[in-house]
């Protein structure tokens, strides 16, 4: 196994470690253990105390670090996961775990902006020869495609679960990068799993695009028995950016892509699907589903489900929200996703973008949700392209051309039914991607990527090559959560863009990775800045 460990300091004595332990416990830090922050994929950091809507205006670049990951197609780095209180041989550390598409994992000391260890996975999969050296296609890049998930197993002890390109589940010690146990096959090799989830000792993922000739399935890996369960929708794949979400009863949710919707034949394309692990057999079984009333119309126009679906409680009931490239939000009661006919949502919003019915526009990525101090439930959605001309919010921050973040409030209408009301629309963002929220501040960003999908033509390359040439740079924005007012932006500090990645936030820091392998850490003015731009050398 090709593994490099950067030792930099000698180990301290056991007595010194014991002495530091009480201090480490007293200074409890927040975690960000999964893509989207939690198993429900809310993208809400509940434990942020350093950055506030009053102090975020002074946020600065604390550091940036160049990682040696090689891009594949348009993929590069995935959103960092944050282990806030890791016990290491040299004392407690806050560590960021970053996955790279080329089967790489990096551990970074966030206080210093330096690399602690890195691991490149061995592989049982042999890649066939490719022209161009970046994998098969934008949809099927090959490599590691699922953001890992972390688990705190005891105070100071964290485990990282990772699925490598060959489909094997890896279990790593976050402090050292060492394998805790041998890898075990979870999903077929050379597929395209999305961000991992972990609930009650079970790892979940979903796959899409039929990459590597593999079926599009939900997958579950039971850690206690090492049994794998799967369930197939019989049609379109599931491609929620931040992975499937899990409800309080263990049901796993993801929307399926373009495909036939014929439930009588167990074919569930163009639908929101809930599956659940059988506790005896460990198999995944269909629990419920919802298909929009215009599912066939959406399928013909490639407007399929395209976003991870946050789950939350509202007045004693559990709901999820989701969206698609059509650009409206569905509110679904998880006790009966689509009612008796599987076609009736609890509520659906009007269209708020994609008036042109363009399959490259609409909602992509993930929604977010949070609750303010007054108990109001908020829903956030990124979108690509202009705002719909018939959609209005009470607060709007200028013309939207390339994309924005839209906010909705969940309230009861006159009949007592839950309803999503528009609250605000942010400033224009170049291809707005999934927001995260912490302590009254929404962190949103424009990815800067070119989303134009076309064949080669005179003067323009096609496919990934053309999109890479035309992409610009990402910009992160801090917005007041209740109004959408811009409080801060990264401006031109980020020099590259990203594709199908995201933000992470914890303990006064906001992280974003880019196509060129650079990881940026912006943070509170009270935190020390240790800018690092040179590639980190292994030793």
Labelled PLM ranges:
Residues 27-62, 81:
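Blade/loop signatures of beta-propeller domains
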Residues 49-74, 87-92, 103-142, 150-158, ...:
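Extracytoplasmic/lumenal domain signature
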Residues 1-12:
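Bacterial N-terminal signal peptides that target proteins for export
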Residues 78-84, 96-98:
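General structural concept
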Residues 22-27, 536-539:
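Polybasic, low-complexity, intrinsically disordered segments
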Residues 15-23:
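C-terminal segment of classical bacterial N-terminal signal peptides
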């Amino acid at each position: 196994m090709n593994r490099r460990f950067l030792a930099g300091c000698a180990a301290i004595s056991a007595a010194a470690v014991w002495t530091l332990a009480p201090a480490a416990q007293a200074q409890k830090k927040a975690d960000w253990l999964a893509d989207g922050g939690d198993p429900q994929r809310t993208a809400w950091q509940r434990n942020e105390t350093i950055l506030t809507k009053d102090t975020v205006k002074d946020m600065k670049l604390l550091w940036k670090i160049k990682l040696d990951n090689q891009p594949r197609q348009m993929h590069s780095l995935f959103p960092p996961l944050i282990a806030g209180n890791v016990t290491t041989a040299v004392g407690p550390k806050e560590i960021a775990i970053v996955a790279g598409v080329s089967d790489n994992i990096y551990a970074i000391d966030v206080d210093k902006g330096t690399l602690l260890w890195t691991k490149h996975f061995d592989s049982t999969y042999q890649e066939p020869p490719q022209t161009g050296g970046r994998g098969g296609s934008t949809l099927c890049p090959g490599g590691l495609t699922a953001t890992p998930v972390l688990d705190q197993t005891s105070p100071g002890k964290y485990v990282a679960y990772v699925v490598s390109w060959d489909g094997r589940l890896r279990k790593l010690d976050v402090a050292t990068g060492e394998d805790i146990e041998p890898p075990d096959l979870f999903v077929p090799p050379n597929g395209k799993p999305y961000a991992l989830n972990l609930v009650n000792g079970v790892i979940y993922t979903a796959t899409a695009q039929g990459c590597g000739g593999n079926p599009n399935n939900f997958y579950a890996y039971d850690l206690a028995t090492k049994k794998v369960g799967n369930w197939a929708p019989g049609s379109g794949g599931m491609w929620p950016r931040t992975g499937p979400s899990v409800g309080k009863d263990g049901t796993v949710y993801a929307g399926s892509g373009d495909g036939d919707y014929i439930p009588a034949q167990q074919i569930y394309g163009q639908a929101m699907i809930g599956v659940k692990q059988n506790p005896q057999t460990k198999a995944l079984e269909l629990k419920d589903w919802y298909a929009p009333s215009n599912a066939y119309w959406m399928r013909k126009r490639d407007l399929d489900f395209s976003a991870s679906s946050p789950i939350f409680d509202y007045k004693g009931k559990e709901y999820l929200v989701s969206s698609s490239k059509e650009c409206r939000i569905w509110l679904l009661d998880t006790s009966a996703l689509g009612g008796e006919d599987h076609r009736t949502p609890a509520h659906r919003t009007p269209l708020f973008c994609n008036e042109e019915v363009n399959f490259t526009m609409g909602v992509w990525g993930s929604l977010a949700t949070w609750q303010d101090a007054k108990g109001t439930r908020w829903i956030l959605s990124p979108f690509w392209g202009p705002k719909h001309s018939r959609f209005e919010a009470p607060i709007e921050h200028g013309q939207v051309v390339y994309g924005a973040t839209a906010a909705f409030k969940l309230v009861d209408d006159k009949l007592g039914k839950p309803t999503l009301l528009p609250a605000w629309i942010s400033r224009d963002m170049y291809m707005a991607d999934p927001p995260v929220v912490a302590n009254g501040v929404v962190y949103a960003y424009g990815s800067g990527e070119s989303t134009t999908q076309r064949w080669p033509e005179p003067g323009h390359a096609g496919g990934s090559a053309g999109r890479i040439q035309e992409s610009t740079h990402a910009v992160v924005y801090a917005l007041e959560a209740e109004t959408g007012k811009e409080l801060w932006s990264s401006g031109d500090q980020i020099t590259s863009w990203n594709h199908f990645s995201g933000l992470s936030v914890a303990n006064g820091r906001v992280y974003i990775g880019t196509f060129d392998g650079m990881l940026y850490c912006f943070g509170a003015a009270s935190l020390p800045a240790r800018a690092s731009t040179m590639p980190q050398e292994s030793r």
